[in-house]
Structures are given as C-alpha cells and as structure tokens.
C-alpha cells in the first residue's frame, strides 16, 4: 500500500444499495472495497460529506451488512464512501470475503 490509504483495497463486483436520509434508495456496483470503505459506480451525484447508509451482501453474514458511511469523493461515474464504525462481526466477515478477492493495485 502506498499514499494515504490505511486499508488494502480488493477488487469486487457486488451490488450496493445507498440510502440518503429522506430520499429514495439507489443502487450502484462496487468496484473495490476495504475495511475503510467502498468505491462504487453510479450515475447518481452525491455531494462530498453526505452521510448515507450502505447495504451490501457479504457471504459470511446471514443478512446484508448495513453500514453508515460518508461521501469522501465523487466523480461523474462513481462515488467513494468511507465507512463509519464497523461491528466486529462485519470486520470478521469482510476479512473472510477478502481472502477470495484480488487486491487492487496501488495508485502510483
């Protein structure tokens, strides 16, 4: 890992459901994931700093993970979300999931 990233990222392709308070849920496609957050493809514009709830499937969990997150950056085709607090079971399940994924190459 290089740069400012604290957590290793992993390439994946899973659906992501995003809920902003008082607005309709929308979906995106996760490009990569780490213990720190998610980058997803979507055509929905979300301003920096927006707080959301993310819902996504992690194979080791019986139910979808529902995680509070904050928009840290946005591009025309996608959004980077930083997770709030993850529960211990979610950290464990994500680490199990990562064992089957390919690490995302570091940014140069």
Outline where the language-model segments fall:
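Structured alpha-helical
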Residues: 1-108
């Amino acid at each position: 890992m290089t740069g400012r990233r604290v957590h290793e990222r992993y390439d994946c392709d899973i659906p992501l459901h995003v809920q902003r308070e008082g607005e309709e849920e929308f979906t995106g496609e996760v490009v990569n994931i780490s213990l720190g957050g998610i980058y997803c493809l979507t055509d929905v514009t979300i301003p920096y700093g927006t707080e959301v709830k993310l819902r996504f499937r992690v194979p080791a969990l019986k139910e979808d993970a529902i995680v509070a997150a904050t928009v840290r950056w946005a591009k025309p085709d996608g959004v980077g979300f930083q997770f709030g607090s993850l529960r211990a079971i979610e950290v464990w399940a994500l680490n199990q999931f990562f064992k089957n994924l390919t690490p995302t190459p570091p940014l140069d």
